[in-house]
Structure formats: C-alpha cells, structure tokens
Amino acid sequence: MSGQQKTSELVFFVNGKKVTDTNPDPECTLLTYLRDKLRLCGTKLGCAEGGCGACTVVISRMDRGQNKIRHLAVNACLTPVCAMHGCAVTTVEGIGSTRTRLHPVQERLAKAHGSQCGFCTPGIVMSMYALLRSAEQPSMRDLEVAFQGNLCRCTGYRPILEGYKTFTKEFACGMGDKCCKVNGKGCGGGDDTQSVTDDTLFERSQFQPLDPSQEPIFPPELQLTPTYDSESLIFSSERVTWYRPTTLQELLQLKSDHPSAKLVVGNTEVGVEVKFKHFLYPHLINPTQVPELLEVRESEESIYFGAAVSLMEIDALLRQRIEELPEAQTRLFQCAVDMLHYFAGKQIRNVACLGGNIMTGSPISDMNPVLTAAGARLEVASLVGGKTSHRTVHMGTGFFTGYRRNVIEPHEVLLGIHFQKTTPDQHVVAFKQARRRDDDIAIVNAAVNVRFEPRTNVVAGISMAFGGMAPTTVLAPRTSQLMVKQPLDHHLVERVAESLCGELPLAASAPGGMIAYRRALVVSLIFKAYLSISRKLSEAGIISTDAIPAEERSGAELFHTPVLRSAQLFERVCSEQPVCDPIGRPEVHAAALKQATGEAIYTDDIPRMDGELYLGLVLSTKPRAKITKLDASEALALEGVHAFFSHKDLTEHENEVGPVFHDEHVFAAAEVHCYGQIVGAVAADNKALAQRAARLVRVEYEELAPVIVTIEQAIEHGSYFPDYPRYVNKGNVEEAFAAAEHTYEGSCRMGGQEHFYLETHAAVAVPRDSDELELFCSTQHPSEVQKLVAHVTTLPAHRVVCRAKRLGGGFGGKESRGISVALPVALAAYRLRRPVRCMLDRDEDMLITGTRHPFLFKYKVAFASDGLITACDIECYNNAGWSMDLSFSVLERAMYHFENCYRIPNVRVGGWVCKTNLPSNTAFRGFGGPQGMFAGEHIIRDVARIVGRDVLDVMRLNFYKTGDITHYNQKLEHFPIERCLDDCLAQSRYHEKRTEIAKFNRENRWRKRGMAVIPTKYGIAFGVMHLNQAGALINVYGDGSVLLSHGGVEIGQGLNTKMIQCAARALGIPIELIHISETATDKVPNTSPTAASVGSDLNGMAVLDACEKLNKRLAPIKEALPQGTWQEWINKAYFDRVSLSATGFYAMPGIGYHPETNPNARTYSYYTNGVGISVVEIDCLTGDHQVLSTDIVMDIGSSINPAIDIGQIEGAFMQGYGLFTLEELMYSPQGMLYSRGPGMYKLPGFADIPGEFNVSLLTGAPNPRAVYSSKAVGEPPLFIGSSAFFAIKEAIAAARQEQGLTGDFPLEAPSTSARIRMACQDKFTNLLEIPEEGSFTPWNIVP
C-alpha cells in the first residue's frame, strides 16, 4: 500500500448530505472543512486543542461488529477530515433551526436562559444531543460526564443544567403514564433532584417533548456499503500523506517503510503538536480499521483491549465487568475507571485510545501510572524479514527510556494491552491531582498495586508509580522494597513518606513549577492510598476497624459532583401590568434561539468575500530588545503571499496608538517591550498559509536589560508610569494612628486573570468606493476602533464605519485591545484594496491581549479594642504591563473601592502604576474594584482576628450607614447593605451551618470546612466624565415594525433584550415588533464603550428619550384615533408626513467629581450592593476543594429582566470564583506566558459550581437614578466570588489549628490547590526541604 500513488476519494455525510472530495488535505481539520468549505459556521473555534467544546459535533458511524450505529460527540478542531470517510457528521445546523423546527435540546437551553454570548452554545447543544442519541433518558451523572469537555464563560452553568435536567431520569413526574411528557403535551412536571428552583424563570410546560423517532436517519448508503470501512485509503497533499490500512499486514508494512510515521486514532496529541508546536509529520497512519487493533477479548486472567479501542469503550466494558464479576477481581478495573472519569472531556475519550496514551508517554499521563504499577502486558508486532513478528512487553521498570520514549521500536506497532484481573489479596488504587478536577492534566498522579500475605496486612509485594515527578512515569523501587514483609500501618507509612522524599527528588527549577507542592503530593497521595486500602482491609475483617482513627478515614475520599440544588427568587410583576409590557418579566435573550441553532453570526462567521486575504501576525519572541533585522523575503517568496506590513509602512505618528495615551504601536518599531508584541503582519490567501508565512519572517534582536516582570521587580527598579504615585486623603491618618488602641500592618496580593471570552479577537475589513472602509469587529468600543483606524489610514472618521453585531464574550477584554487586530487588518485592506480578515488563535489571543491587573497591597490599619476601624494607610500597586492602556483608571477604582462596605474616618490611599515587560494589562469585569475590595476584606478579617471577635460582628460594627461619606467625598444614599446581609444570613441558614461546620471539623482531620460572608459595594459610572453618555436611533416603518439602534454592544449580557423591553414599554407595543440589527458607528456616532456596567443605564435612557420624541409626535394622532392600533397610528402618521425616525441622547447627571475643580459632584451615579455566603470543603492532603453552597442576595433595584439579571449574577460569581481560587497565569521569569490555552489555564467548569446555588434579588428597593428604577448588574456580583477564597482560608486555619499553628498566614489569590495544600502544614510537608528563595531560578513566577 505504501507504494500506492493514487489518491483515494473521501466520502462522508454532513447533516444528511453526501460530501465527496477527490483531493482532501490531510492537514485539514473537520472544523476547518465545515466552516471554510461547507460554510457551516455554527460550529465554533474556541481553542483548537480540544479543551473548550465550542467545536463539538456528533459523528455517527456503523459498528459492523455489533451491527449498531454509534453516535459520538467529538472535537471538530482536532478531528482530521480524512478520518471522516464513511461517517455521518451532524452539526448544530443539522438538528433544527428557527426557520423550520427547533430541536428540544436547542429550545430548552434557550428558554431556560442557558445562552448569553452564545459562542459556546452550539457545542453544548451538540454534547447534549449526542447524549440523547445514545441514551434517550439519561441520568444526572450522564449529564455531568457529557459536559466535562465544555466550557462556558458567561452563564455560571446553572441555567444550562436546569434546562437539560428536564431530559433526565431524575426529572420525574408523579403523574406516571399520564405525564404530559408521555402524552406529548410538553412538561410542567415534577423533579426528583430536590431543586427548589422558582420555575417562573421559564415555563417547562412550553417545552416540546423529545421524540427520538424524529431524529435524522443514518445514511442508508453508509449502512449498506461495507467497503467504506474495508477499503484501504490514501490521501496526499503537498506536505503530508494520510494512510488508512485495513489489515495488520498493511499497517506493519507502512510502519516498516516509514518508521517515523505517526499512528493517529483520536489525533488528540498529534493535532496539538501540529497546531501549536508546528510539527510536520509527512506520514500519518490511521489504524482504526485494522481488526487486530480493535479486538476485545476476555480470559480467566485478563481482559485484552486492542490499542485503538477508544477510552469510552474501555470504560463501558470495564464498568460492565465491575457489575458482573466479584469485587476482588475488578480492583484494577475500578482503578482504571476512576482515572478515566477525570481523563480529559468526553469528546476526547470518545476517540482517544489507550495505545496512544502509552506510546505518547506523557510524564503526566493519567493511565500510564496505573498500567505501570500493574505491570501491564503489551502485545507488539512488526515486520521482520517480510514476516510478522510478535513479542510481549511489560510496562514496569525500564519500559520508559526517556521523555516520550519507550522500549517499543519505531518500526513496531502496539497491538493491545492486557488488563489483569486482581486476586483477593491484591489492591490497586490510584489518585490524580490537577488544578481542576474535570478535564485537566495532572500535576501529580500516583498508582499503587499491592499484594498482601493471605488474609493479613503484611505486604508481599508492592509497586508504586508516579506521574509528574520526572520526564517519564517513574516507579519507587527502593521504597517499595522497604515495605515488603512489613504490616501496612501508620508506622510503615511514615517511613514510606520519608523514603519517598529521598527517592523522588525534584530540582528547584524543574519544568512545571510547584516543586514543593508536587513533592508533598507524592507522600500525600500515598497516604490517601494507605487510608483507602486500610479501609478495604477493615471492611474485609483483616484489620481492626480501629486501625484507622475515625477522624482520619475521610482522608481517603475524593470529591464528587453533587446534583445541583438551586433557587432564584425575584419580585414578580403585579397582576395589573399589561401583558404587552415586558419590564420586570424574565424574557428570553433576544438571540438565544439563533445562538442555540448556530444561526447567530459572529465576526468570523461572515461569509468569505471575493479576493479576501487573511492576515497572519508576526509576534515578538523577546521580552525587551532592539530589533536589529526584519526580513520577510522568505515569507513573500511563498505562492499566495501578497504583502508584508511593518512599522516601515506607517509614519511615526500613524504608528502611535492607544485608547487614551498614544504610547503603543500598531507594529513594534525600534524596540519590543514584551513577548507577543506585534512586529509585523503577512497577508496571504488563507489562514494556514498566512500563519506559516508569518513564522518565516526573520526578526533579529539585541536583548536589553533589565527585564521587569513582577510588581516587586518594578518596585525594586522604581519602574512606574509618570505622575505616579497618586494619593487620596481623608481626615488625619497620622493623628488617628497616634491615638489608636491597636495598629496592624499587613499585605495581600492577587494575580491577574485571563478574559477567556470564547470568541477571540476578530476583524474583517472591506474597502469600499469613495475611499470608505467598512470594519466588522469583535469590539466593545466600535467608536474607538473607528477613530484609530481613521488615524492609521489618515482617513476622516466619516469614511470609516465599524460594525459589531454581537460578541462571543468580552468582559472588558475587548474594550481597548481590539485595536491589536483591527488596525493591522484595516491597514492591509486599505493598502491592498482587498477584503482582509484575521481571527486570533487562542494562544495568540492570550499572548497578545493582556489580562486583569495583578495587584499588591500594603496597609496599616488603626482600630479600637472592639474592632472599630479608625484609620487606614494603604499602598496599591498594579502591574500595568508595558503601556498605560486603562491602567490608571483601573488603579483609581481600586483606590476608591478598597474600603468596600466599611466606614473608615481617616484614610490615605496611595497608588502606583507599575511599568513592566508584559503585554499591556487592561479592563476586566470589575475594573480594579474586586482587587481593591480584596484588600478591604483582608483588613476587616485582620482586625477581627486581633481583637478576638467574630468577623460578622466586626463587619456590622464598621458598615457604612446611609448618609455616610466615602474617602472620595461621596454621600451614600439608600445604602441597604445590612438588609442584604440579614436576608442572606437567613437564606443561607448561616448560624445553623456554623454549628455544622464546627462539628465536621472536629470529626475530620484531613477534610476541613470553612464559611465566609462577603458584602460588596460597587460604584456605577465611568471614571471619566465624558464617557457617561449614550445615543439611540429609532426608525418606525410603515407596517409598524421598529428598528432600534443604540450605542451599546451586545456581548451576551442581554443588553439588546433589555433595550427592546424598554422601548416596548415606552411605546406601548409588543417586543415582537422591535428589532435590533447591530451596533454601528453610522447609526449612532461617538459611542462610549460598552463597559463599566452602565450599558443599560446609559443606552436605556437614550432609548427612552427617542421613544418620548416619537410619542409626542404620535400623541395628536392617538387622540384623534383613541381606539386605533399601533399599525393604524403609524400608517396615519406616515400619510400625515409625521417623522417616524427619532434620535435619543442621555448624559448621566450629577457626576464628574474632582477634589479641586468639581468637589460637589458624585464620582458614581449610585452603588449596587450585595452579600454572598459560601461554604467550602478542602482536602488538606491534596489542596483540592469544593464549594458546597453559595447564597447571594443582590440589590439591583427593580429588575428589567430577572432572568438576565440572575444570569449575570451567577456568571459574575463564577468568574469571580475562578479569579480568586482557580485561574492562575503562568509566566516564565522572562515574562513569557506559559498558560496560553485551556490545557494550562483553567477556568471553572460545570463540576465547579456550588452544590447549592441560591440567588435572591432584594425586593422593594427601586433606584431613582437609572432606567425604570433598575440597577447595573454586570460587574458588582463578581467580588462575591471571593467568598469561596475566604471560606477556603477559614478551612485552612482550622487545619493549621490542629497543628498548633494559630497565627495568621499568607494566602495569595488565586487559592490554587498548591497554595491550599502548602498552607495546611503537617507532618508530610514538614518532611520537605524547601530551597531558599533566590538560590535558584524558578520555572515560573507570579507577575
């Protein structure tokens, strides 16, 4: 076969339609094929590494061995299109649409308010669809597993689960056979999941029933044509050849001819290497039709799995055998199943195979430690002298010979793996610790295979294997030998721990970092294994039940995702409110149905235009250096490459840009200031070519020093932006300190946060006639893009139009940083007179665009013996990166919010904007507020600890009261924080839980719980006065339909939905008559960014202004036709020549405070307040944690749309939870970002939401300063996520107290598993020798 030259024909089906390709590209993914060739853009590119699930599609294939059709959710971003031969692909467009019929999975997600920005929605829909095609009535556990590979950055996951649990077995109805789900009338049924959800947020009775008989049939041609599976295939392109052999002989011959060829089954490793490491494999072999690699057979001693059998198939069969066979025989099976549950996401497990896992040899593989400890037997084959040769290899000592290398020769093929059945005296256990439990790579994992002397706890033999401690999976033979013939008890385990510390060292600079934590995990996981095995020995009566102290037994347990319980409480509209008046009603997001069907168009979904080019960016590979050479000749020599752009194509003035200060460059000029700075751009025919050409551009540097990365380094070098520090003062701090009963000095620190909007930055620029330039841009600030494009091209602004229909998330990251992509794209389009497009890959986006600002706070506080705070002197430092961007405003908000809800009569706040060699950090939801309040909550807890009072009491003592004045001279009006607190305490059963937590902590040594209360006060307004304005335009057409335009951008926050609701009430018409098309600078000029949570406040009032103008014009007509309809009034107005178009404008009154020029004005229009209470449990041995419950009460005035507002609260909480506990940016000491995708950067997933999640909107609290008495909601709830952080800190304190450690201890945010574990000092951490800081160069640092 390897000598075959003819390229085969690729045949597969997509949404029921046959696709035939005579020249497929082996380098092309299914996602690229769907989007670029078939124009099916519902499937999204979110990460390109199989970590976010936005690209999920369903692959259906005929299993001829079992004569059944299998439906699998897969990641289209990793799936090679050549692997689709003989398959049927279903995308989100193929299951339903708004124009024909919605599928129930689309409808329920949308109507349950489970779609906000909508970019992740098609992937989540298809994960659910795949589950229902495999199990018509799944369980809640099935639901949990189905979504392990999907991420959502907006919703907080709760509404998605609430909508989809209506498909599950647990969603039961007491009507039995009379249930409306059975008789096809939809469901308003019951719920066995104990959810107390107020189901008025959505009407379950409106859901259409699921009818499996209506699903698309599997293409008969594929079902009836076995040659699709039996024929050998070869697909060739200029660089790569793809082979699909169908016999073992063919496979071995190919491997003999091409020993370096890669075998590709799921492409989950090779795909990532090709995409991000730019590896080129000229020969790829797909062995999925070779029977010997798909074989499954069972004997008395083992189960044999072919090397290409998928992990999900292995999991299913092992689970079946666990149910059928005696427990003593299935301990290895159970261990494997436990590890597989946390192995990637379901989309990966559906296609990945165990053979690939073994042969890849990752040092942090989840399965290799299990197989190594078990000494798994492998079957290997090769061609020797033209004949097939077989041999057996054992995984164990010597199997792995180096990083990603093993004893299997390049020309050999792994055929399969034997899973041994265990004996009654054998126990196998394994543990994995990662940053996040679901879909994450291990930090350290461990597997133990131990045999005991019959009916004793005396070790007869033991094998311990570890991942994450060396370049390969490693064994601990010396420690294992020490254990032989010894009883497994506490004494032995202590000796084992000490021995392992010596046997498994780790260099202080080892890749991956977290050195002390990883070493601690080795002994901690072995201790968990000891507890787990001892419990089983105790249950078998082999050792005494008292052998393990009762308080230690829970140390063996793992966290499991509980079934969600939730409540959403809000004020219902009064019965007298007209039905057509939507204000206060939980209307569905205006675009939700389009998003759920894949019909919603985002920037990169815009159809390709004739002559369109793609722009590939050339990025700096140095943190600080002079550019000595820039040579694009090699790139320009490629066919299909049309131009290269750099600073040489602009004047110095044109190249200087920035949102406020023009201290940035479109293209780096003489110097680069950070990794990832844009040096140039290549315009080519397509994305792959443009990116390949960009990598060929030669940039030579002369490196400069010093390179400043961290805040501490900036302080050391005095590296601050001009005009800093700045101070805000109130009262007399020095006098207050002199008179104080107590003073305390402390500090706290928190890291940055990646926005991780699911849609990366994107722009399309189209030159028009008359020197016009039209941009479609994923930006929160179209007018800023318009202004800077005009600046760069030297066009007047009226020749540049910027459009933003919708964004796939923003969170502040698209407020100013959109120019990074938009300006090079616009320049290229303008100069080449051709349409140009660019959408950043995830790694590019994370490298280029900056993050939330890391902060360091140093404070001194004065207080009385009862805890009343009298003064605070605080220094605030933020890490701005290399340019100013909006860092000055972020710092100012932090300085204005540090006191949170607490009155401090004497204040001195100093602020420093640190200049470092990082990409410029930027706006992020909260905009410095959460960082400032983080310091305030440390201060209040420090005070409570020192005076020995309960934190809650000290909070109440120091709370602001209505009428108090802040340190920036703003009087607090309508300040309901005590009411929010009281409601939240009652809702959460705070005092009852306090008692329960104390009891739990007494009874458990290695598990601890904590509880924290977090209040929040968030000021609403832009920090600069001129941005607090908005405009609107309303056009009414002859048929009565209304086209509404406003200056805000729909980012997923429901702004368009709310604006439609506002206009509907103002005009007295149904929402169905109103449509918003897009945000565009030619409709509403000079817009402010959609940011600062004021989108509804500003644009809503502008919309009302426009509506009032229309109403005044229509008033005489309505008086003349009092019984007329809206359409009749509009028709009459048209014929009476009354203008049916109106503009609206609003400028927020009473703001613009400046201590010298405008001292009587407000800084903020008003405040949004709330209180959150979280209960958290930690595993002291691993640092893992779980949020058991969260209760939130928010004062958001009179809600315009409670479903959207509650969704914003839940989403903000989860984003804040990620900020404070989970999301860690990893940088090299030179400032290179390691965490450039979901593989290393972990945001919360479905399994991370609180087990009980209750949100209540404060009733009877209208706000006179915003549209329809509402309040801003986007940013204020985010800081409540810190309740998990402070609950974790309380739990750690409980663990430390048992060790006699009663003082304060540092804990940086995020409180990752590493920081939690190392703060829980105990006998295991005390075994470690920690090298002195400064004695080595760490692998990573915190900026």
From Swiss-Prot:
SMART domains linked: Ald_Xan_dh_C (SM01008), CO_deh_flav_C (SM01092)
Domain 2Fe-2S ferredoxin-type, residue spans: 8-95
Annotated positions binding FAD: 263-270, 343, 353-357, 366, 414, 432
GO CC, any one term: peroxisome
Binding site for [2Fe-2S] cluster 1: 47, 52, 55, 77
Keyword Hydrolase included in the entry's annotation: no
PANTHER family per UniProt: XANTHINE DEHYDROGENASE
Role: Key enzyme in purine degradation. Catalyzes the oxidation of hypoxanthine to xanthine. Catalyzes the oxidation of xanthine to uric acid.
Protein name, entry field: Xanthine dehydrogenase
Gene this protein is translated from: ry
